[in-house]
Amino acid sequence: MPQINDLSRSLTAFEQDQTLVVVIEVSLSSWLVGGALPGVARQPMKKLGPDKDVLLALIWRWKDEASRSGRDIRRVCVAYEAGRDGFWLARSLLEHGIETYVIHSASVSVSREQRRAKTDRLDTELLKRAFLGWLRGERGHCSMVAIPTIQEEDARRPNREREKLVGDRTRVINRIKATLIRFGIRTFKPTLRKAEERLKELRTAEGVPLLENTRGELLRDIARLRMIQEQIKEIEQRRLRDLEASSAKPGPHAMVRLIARVVGIGIETADMLVHEILSRNLRDRQALARYAGLTGSPDESGSRRREKGLSRSGNARVRRGMIQLAWRFLQFQKDSALARWYRERTADRRSSTRKTMIVALARKLLIALWLLVTTGQIPEGASLRPAI
């Protein structure tokens, strides 16, 4: 069974005299590497180019320096902050036998001064202090991000690419309509198959055909729209082929097919949920809700008690998708226990109550789908399609 992710603190005993600790402040043009060497009074810091081999040579040199001071180095721990570079560096260092972690960038506490000093050197020292506290097993210093395999990262690309293409399609359609409205044309539909032919027949509100430059711009926009639609179709067809090819194999594709059996959930939503959250082996339902950002933000001080709303600290794709799915679930699963629970708590029909409770429903629904793919427990009263 895959190991459950619990990265809020280290569960390994920290022997400071036997552990070389290295942190990396990663930027686009350079890496600033700081270390804590057992037996060495100085706290070395070295600026490197973004080169993995040079970094490895520096780590081994620091290890030899600590060994020459009489320390038996049995553990090398490296950490850097999650960001643009992703996880390739962590995977590469792990292949060389180096214990590597990726720090959640929002989990490191910083000074609340209105104008605090910020440099790469100060950031490196801050990361080092947070990482040392995490290695000691103390909570609250920082938390780590689970390092996905390259296959897991690749599996997320189709859904994310499709989401981007759908946004591009909407922008192109809106741009075409906005251009036509300037000439008093409001009924043109750019998604029709014969849109190019209809465009040539259009007349402005002044009764004249579209002029050459405007017509050329619109034809190019329609060509872009056709290309985007073809790419979306290609991604969807490829996903269906992959699901059919792996019909007898356990894994993420089996989870997608299982979730897609729930009436009201399509292949696209199921694929997003599986690859973004449900295949991550999270510890419990609380960790699941926190990762999706579907938890509250309490604000308590003295006698004041209030809720500031959603934390929004997790995966925005999952949070947005679950809110949309919750509304859809009410429409397609009216007889389910979750739908009845929502109706009972929104009997006053107040808009504020419905908006608050839809978030609670989204959280409960996410947990129900997690139980479905991990234990096979079907949501109470939910309707299922026949097995694919």
Identify the function of each model-found stretch.
Residues V23-E25, V33, V78, H104, ...:
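Mobile genetic element proteins and their domesticated derivatives, centered on retroelements
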Residues L28-L56:
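Short glycine-rich, Thr/Ser-proximal phosphate-binding strand/loop in the N-terminal lobe
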Residues P44, Y101-M144, R198-R203, R304-G314:
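Short alpha-helix plus adjacent loop in nuclease-associated cores
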Residues D154-L258:
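Glycine-rich, often acidic, oxyanion-interacting loops/wings at catalytic, nucleic-acid
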Residues A254-R354:
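Phosphate-backbone recognition surface of nucleic-acid-processing proteins
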